[in-house]
Amino acid sequence: MRLTYFLTVIVVATLHAGGTALATAEAPNHAAIVNVASADNVHSLDTTAEIGGRMLRKVKEDTVSKKDHEERGPGAILERQTAFVKKLFSRQNAIVNRAQGAFQRQNAFVNRDQGAFQRQNAFVKRAIQRQNHFKLSDNA
């Protein structure tokens, strides 16, 4: 069974169980809510001139909060998110740069050690060649 049919059956069953669908279908002449201001609101408007009536006070508008609450696009949110991402990447780049610097220092140390090792090997090879040369010249 498809999902749309399943959802349609659920909506119809819910409306039928709640009596919403049948009430409008069975009694089309049933009184509906009228789009007129309620009597309480009209009465309160009339009594504002009297001393005992409820009077509403005007509140000073705060321009900062008005700017914060006005509808706007996602620009401010995106600016905050991009600032956060830039800050995150700058921290990550700093960590990567430190790691690369440490790696380069380690490589320089290893290269220096390898150079010393190669020089030592060359010295040992020359010493062995000299010994072999002297042995050959002694035997001749």
Curated annotation (Swiss-Prot):
Changing residue 110 to A: Impairs interaction with host ADA2 and subsequent virulence. The keyword Transport does not apply. Changing residue 109 to A: Impairs interaction with host ADA2 and subsequent virulence. Its main location: secreted. Induction: Expression is strongly up-regulated during the early stages of infection. Disruption phenotype: Leads to reduced virulence on etiolated soybean hypocotyls. The RxLR-dEER motif acts to carry the protein into the host cell cytoplasm through binding to cell surface phosphatidylinositol-3-phosphate. The two internal repeats IR1 and IR2, in the C-terminus, are required for the interaction with host ADA2. This is RxLR effector protein Avh23. It comes from Phytophthora sojae. The gene is Avh23.
